[in-house]
């Protein structure tokens, strides 16, 4: 029909009525006048799964959009959004027929049309048809009837992204069931986007510190920083500020929105501290985001300013010691992803624990910023354990190990102004690398410590944008910059530009109302308990959960007592967690530190405390008190060497096999490293990603609270491809416990079926087979059970028939893959099953 212009069906009917082929009503004329023009081909689109031996699929077509254009013909039956494909008839949805002047034109037109089709809710054979159209044998016109049998590459099918449907399903779930992250918490009243500063996106990008690093290399760059008169500023808003104030809950979407503004309006910043610490696992565990994607996207938006992370030495970005080869691999992958400055620290200032991580950083060509964690009080003559000499010796040792910059990590805000002045002045005389001062404003006075340090040539200081500063976060960046204007240490940062960026953060913070920590007043009690800023609000939240909020002063006192019991140690993740766990444990059980040493009492200490005292986190100066070791570790031999030395090297190949199982593709090195760091967290994240796709681009109000009817937003899923999502309404609950959530997607009606967890379904969902369990026999296709050939207790042999399924006029026999015994049969003849339903259990 397409190449001759003759309506064959109509002509057949007319011939059947008795007309001769030459009849004028047929319009065929003489045979010689019938000519063919061009080429035509037909693709039959069916609900068959080519990845599962073309097993038919059935169900509801959630969305249907067809192709069109010149030379395109569609012959469809029940192909439309909402159509139900049942298992009792043919699986064909639509016949796509195209024509072109050349065979190659017809192929290209067919491919274009197949790619334009959007069919969601049921599997189709479109991926297979595209493989055929792309194959050289087909393009050359040399196919035979054995083509498919002899060409297994046709079944190397691309994974369909299906991004819009997955995102709508996630949004529907939040609308119907809420987001567990914010349940029971305060609701944010802000829905509109935070305002962005004005800048010219087409203007040349100003030069920044990263440009200077690439020009000079890390060693010369370090000297260049030291030679500058200005005080460099690192902005911690992207990481430590929200880690301290909002439990690390800021999302990539909000960080990315403001990133380019930083590159254009604040190029004189030393760095953006935006990765590492708790962000790595929190992004996957709670925000369902890929931490590597956050790094890559911010790097793309900010190519001119240094990006900085916090690296917990042999703990990497975790809470335990990892094998040395995992630490090295993580550092390399991070540097390759675009990270410039690694702030390396050990929770006990134990130099041997820092060496592997520092060496790994030095090998990458990135900046190694080695840290000394500040504790005690160097101006208090009664506190002699951590005196000035102690810190000077540490600094010299780190410089000798190759550090490019020395960080003073004052994680609790203990370094008083005069102490900062003395420490920095002395270190400047003793070492030859720049000094970077990090502190928390828990005591409310730490801006003075920075300014006192600036008087004696402090090189770099950490601060946070005004709305994200103060309390357990860092000092106020905006006022710091203003206070140094018109002095010889002025920062070079533009105050008005910073104020525009500040307005963005002020509004963005309103999105995170559910995570606002209780504002605890700044008190001098900090100098007694020495609790790190990143722990202070978290421990208070834990105390609240245990019903100890009204005993907070007691918790702080016991925390200080626990520190002294353990020998007065450096307290930062993970050692601070162990001290906090012990303090809460004692207060909750109405015990004191005296009870810890009372051998007549049987105490089950928290695991973190046992690990700390047992040496799994390293060794403090002078070690732990012997009586504490004996009481807490008991019969277990404590570790005195570096924990990483006793850990066997991680088997990357074996880990890759495990990752491949749940990713269902070959994993990258980066994915294997992530799995080795957080196996369960990463596996759960991948499962969420498979179900809902990339949710990091959803605006924060809708991610946490869902949309209200009529609310609309746009999200870019790739360059040049934007989804405009409008929520309409939710249906009443269905008998199976689902609700239908109705949307408009790019102006077209779409819906998502979501389980309402508050409803009791009339019929329980069927048990699903564990496809990794050889004892589970699952359905390979949706259909009806025609016959069951076994019963519980039967001894079966390999190849024996177990049952028969039927769908769309096709019967499939399920045979045993090995000798076994039937334990349980979950189906019966006449029962409808879905793909993956558990049918038979073996042993």
Predicted regions and their residues:
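Terminal or standalone catalytic/regulatory effector modules within metabolic enzymes
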Residues: 114-119, 147, 151-158, 163-219, ...
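ATP-dependent carboxylate activation and anion-phosphoryl transfer catalytic cores
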Residues: 1-183
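Conserved, mostly hydrophobic/aromatic
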Residues: 233, 241, 344, 406, ...
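Active-site beta-loop-alpha junctions enriched in small/polar residues
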Residues: 239, 275-279, 310-316, 347-349, ...
């Amino acid at each position: 029909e397409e190449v001759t212009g003759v309506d064959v069906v109509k002509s057949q009917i007319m011939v059947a009525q008795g007309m001769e082929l030459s009849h004028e009503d047929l319009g065929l004329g003489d045979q010689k006048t019938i000519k063919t023009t061009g080429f035509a081909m037909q693709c039959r689109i069916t609900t068959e799964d080519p990845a599962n031996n073309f097993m038919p699929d059935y169900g509801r077509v959630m969305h249907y959009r067809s192709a069109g254009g010149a030379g395109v013909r569609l012959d469809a039956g029940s192909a439309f959004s909402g159509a139900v494909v049942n298992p009792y008839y043919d699986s064909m949805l639509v016949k796509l027929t195209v024509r072109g002047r050349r065979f190659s034109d017809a192929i290209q037109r067919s491919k274009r049309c197949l790619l334009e089709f959007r069919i969601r809710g049921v599997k189709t054979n479109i991926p297979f048809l595209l493989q055929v159209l792309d194959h050289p044998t087909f393009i050359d016109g040399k196919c035979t009837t054995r083509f498919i049998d002899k060409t297994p590459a046709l079944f190397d099918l691309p994974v369909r992204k299906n991004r819009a449907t997955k995102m709508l399903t996630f949004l529907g779930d939040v609308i119907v069931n809420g987001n567990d992250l914010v349940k029971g918490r305060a609701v944010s009243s802000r829905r509109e986007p935070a305002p962005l500063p004005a800048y010219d996106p087409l203007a040349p990008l100003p030069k920044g510190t990263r440009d200077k690093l690439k020009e000079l290399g890390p060693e010369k760059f370090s000297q260049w920083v030291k030679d500058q008169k200005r005080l460099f500023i690192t902005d911690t808003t992207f990481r430590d500020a929200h880690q301290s104030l909002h439990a690390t809950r800021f999302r990539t979407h909000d960080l990315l929105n403001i990133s380019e503004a930083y590159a254009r309006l604040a190029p004189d910043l030393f760095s953006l501290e935006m990765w590492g610490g708790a962000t790595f696992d929190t992004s996957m565990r709670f925000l369902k985001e890929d931490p590597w994607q956050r790094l890559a996207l911010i790097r793309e938006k900010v190519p001119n300013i240094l990006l900085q992370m916090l690296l917990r030495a042999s703990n990497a970005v975790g809470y335990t010691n990892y094998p040395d080869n995992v630490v090295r691999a993580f550092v390399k992958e991070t540097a390759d992803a675009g990270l410039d400055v690694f702030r390396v620290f050990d929770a006990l200032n134990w130099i041997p624990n820092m060496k592997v991580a520092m060496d790994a950083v030095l090998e990458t060509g990135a900046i190694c910023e080695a840290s000394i964690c500040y504790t005690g009080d160097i101006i208090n003559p009664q506190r002699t354990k951590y005196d000035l000499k102690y810190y000077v010796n540490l600094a010299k040792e780190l410089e000798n190990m190759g550090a490019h910059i020395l960080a003073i990590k004052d994680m609790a805000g203990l370094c008083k102004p005069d102490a900062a002045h003395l420490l920095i002045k002395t270190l400047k005389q003793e070492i030859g690398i720049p000094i970077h001062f990090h502190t928390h404003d828990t005591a409310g006075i730490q801006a003075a410590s920075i300014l006192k340090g600036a008087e004696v040539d402090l090189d770099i200081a950490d601060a946070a944008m005004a709305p994200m500063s103060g309390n357990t976060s860092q000092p106020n960046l905006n006022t710091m910059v203003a206070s140094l204007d018109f002095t010889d240490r002025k920062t070079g940062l533009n105050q008005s530009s910073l104020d525009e960026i500040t307005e963005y953060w002020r509004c963005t913070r309103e999105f995170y109302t559910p995570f606002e920590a209780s504002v605890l007043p700044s008190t001098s009690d900090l100098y007694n308990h020495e609790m790190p800023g990143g722990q202070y609000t978290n421990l208070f939240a834990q105390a609240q959960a245990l019903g100890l909020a009204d005993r907070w002063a007691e918790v702080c006192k016991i925390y200080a007592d626990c520190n002294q019991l353990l020998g007065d140690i450096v307290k930062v993740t993970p050692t601070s967690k162990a001290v906090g766990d012990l303090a809460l444990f004692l207060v909750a059980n109405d015990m004191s530190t005296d009870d810890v040493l009372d051998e007549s009492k049987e105490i089950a200490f928290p695991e973190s405390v046992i690990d700390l005292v047992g040496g799994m986190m390293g060794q403090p100066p002078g070690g732990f008190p012997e009586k504490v070791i004996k009481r807490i570790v008991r019969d277990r031999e404590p570790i005195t060497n570096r924990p990483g030395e006793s850990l066997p090297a991680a088997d990357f190949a074996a880990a890759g096999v495990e990752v491949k199982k749940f990713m269902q593709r070959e994993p990258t090195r980066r994915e294997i490293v992530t799995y080795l760091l957080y196996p369960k967290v990463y596996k759960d994240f991948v499962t969420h990603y498979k179900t809902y796709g990339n949710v990091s681009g959803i605006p924060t109000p809708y991610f946490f609270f869902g949309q209200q009817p009529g609310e609309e937003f746009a999200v870019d899923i790739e360059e040049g491809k934007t989804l405009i999502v409008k929520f309409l309404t939710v249906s009443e609950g269905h008998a199976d416990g689902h609700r239908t959530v109705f949307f408009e997607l790019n102006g077209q009606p779409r819906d998502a079926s979501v389980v309402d967890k508050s409803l009791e379904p009339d019929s329980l969902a069927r048990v699903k087979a564990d496809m990794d369990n050889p004892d589970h026999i699952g359905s390979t296709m949706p259909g009806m059970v025609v016959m069951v050939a076994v019963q519980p207790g039967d001894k079966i042999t390999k190849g024996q028939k177990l049952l028969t399924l039927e769908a769309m006029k096709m019967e499939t026999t399920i045979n045993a893959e090995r000798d076994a015994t039937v334990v349980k049969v979950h189906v019966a003849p006449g029962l409808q099953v879905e793909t993956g339903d558990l049918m038979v259990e073996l042993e």
